[in-house]
Swiss-Prot record:
Keywords: Cell membrane, Membrane, Transmembrane, Transmembrane helix. This is UPF0324 membrane protein TauZ. Belongs to the UPF0324 family. The keyword DNA-binding does not apply. The keyword Cell membrane applies. InterPro entries: UPF0324_pro (IPR018383). It holds the Pfam family Cons_hypoth698. The chain crosses the membrane at residues 12-31, 36-55, 75-92, 96-118, 125-147, 162-184, 191-213, 223-245, 258-280, 315-337. It is a multi-pass membrane protein. It comes from Paracoccus denitrificans. Its main location: membrane. It is found in: Cell membrane. One of its GO terms (cellular component) is plasma membrane.
Length: 338
């Protein structure tokens, strides 16, 4: 198993040009984000889309772009586990945990039901529903890694990442005002923001725009949603496998549990046991963020902008409906919990 995780020298040489281009795009996106405030994920995706010609067959960069979009992506998701610990659950309380967990499950079920109304398949429903329910772009990339591939897989992933990133940015501005309108306390505002906004960075921005208590609570709630990524991906993988829909190469069945999910769970367990020093956990979080940023740049490079626009209005309506559903559910839940 370990040997399969370590790229051969030939693979490294073939992949380096494409990886280097993806890393350069990611660094550029981060620079622009730091200086102009736009989300780095969104910028990396848009810059990548403009460089689609680098992924065309026969180019030196194509193999590395494909490698980065797949393998580096999985590494980034696995490293997210180092930020998760069981202590987070105890700090929040059972009522809020139940509300967050129910929001994740019901949003995914809503996506599966609503997708039929707009003529979208179950793959697209799991991709968009999971990304809205859990952690935006990171969840979209993790879920895409276990879904059976088809000719529109890359297009659907780019659409989902683009949509949840834009919606997260809008929510970062709008949702704190809604929290004030609903009369939420600082703690409830944090639960609302952390339980509804898609991406971690926008959750932090929205929470601390209200105050320190709201910001800390929002971040904690968001990380608990992130901790549900591995169980949800595992459930998706098991369901797909049970129905005989999983991808297979050379007639060999795919692994029951993807390696990156195992990595996520192992790191989360080690962190829960206090075996991961705070400095290492912080470093793993930074490495994860950069790996995901580089991977989404590669996904953008791989995707044709023309094909992405073929996704249709039904897909846009679906992801908007999922976002509204989650926000309404958490709002009602907070009022019920009092």
């Amino acid at each position: 198993m370990i040997s399969t995780m370590i790229p051969s020298r030939g693979l490294i040489e073939a992949a380096f040009p494409g990886f280097a281009v993806s890393a350069l795009v990611a660094a550029t996106a981060q620079f622009l984000s730091d200086h102009y405030g736009a989300p780095a994920m969104l910028l990396a995706l848009l810059l990548g889309l403009a460089l689609n010609f680098l992924a065309e067959d026969g180019t030196r960069t194509a193999p590395g772009v494909a490698f980065t979009a797949r393998t580096v992506l999985r590494l980034g998701v696995a490293l997210l586990g180092a930020r998760i610990s069981a202590g987070m659950l105890a700090a929040l309380g059972p009522g809020a945990i139940a509300l967050v967990a129910a929001g994740v499950v019901l949003t995914i079920l809503f996506a599966l039901a609503a997708s039929r109304l707009v003529g979208r398949g179950w793959r697209f429903a799991l991709l968009t529903g999971g990304s809205v329910a859990i952690c935006g772009a990171s969840a979209a990339m993790a879920i895409a890694a276990v879904l059976p591939r088809h000719e529109k897989s890359e297009r659907d992933l780019v659409f989902t990442v683009l949509s949840v990133t834009v919606l997260s940015t809008v929510a970062m501005v709008l949702y704190p005002m809604l929290a004030g309108f609903f009369g939420f306390t600082a703690r409830d505002s944090g639960v609302f923001l952390g339980g509804t906004i898609h991406d971690v960075a926008q959750v932090v921005g929205a929470g601390f725009s209200i105050g320190p208590e709201a910001g800390e609570t929002a971040t904690l709630v968001k990380l608990i949603r992130v901790s549900m990524l591995a169980p949800v991906v595992l459930c998706f993988s098991l369901a797909i496998r049970a129905r005989g829909l999983a991808d297979s190469r050379g007639g060999k069945a795919p692994p029951l549990l993807p390696g990156f999910v195992i990595g996520f769970l192992v790191l989360a367990a080690l962190n829960s046991l206090g075996l991961v020093p705070a400095a290492v956990s912080e470093l793993a979080g930074q490495l994860s963020r950069w790996a995901l940023l580089i991977a989404i740049a590669a996904v953008g490079i791989k995707t044709s902008l023309k094909k992405m626009f073929e996704v249709g209005t039904g897909a846009i309506a679906l992801i908007l409906a999922e976002t509204v559903f989650l926000a309404v559910f958490v709002t009602i839940g907070l009022h019920v919990l009092g």
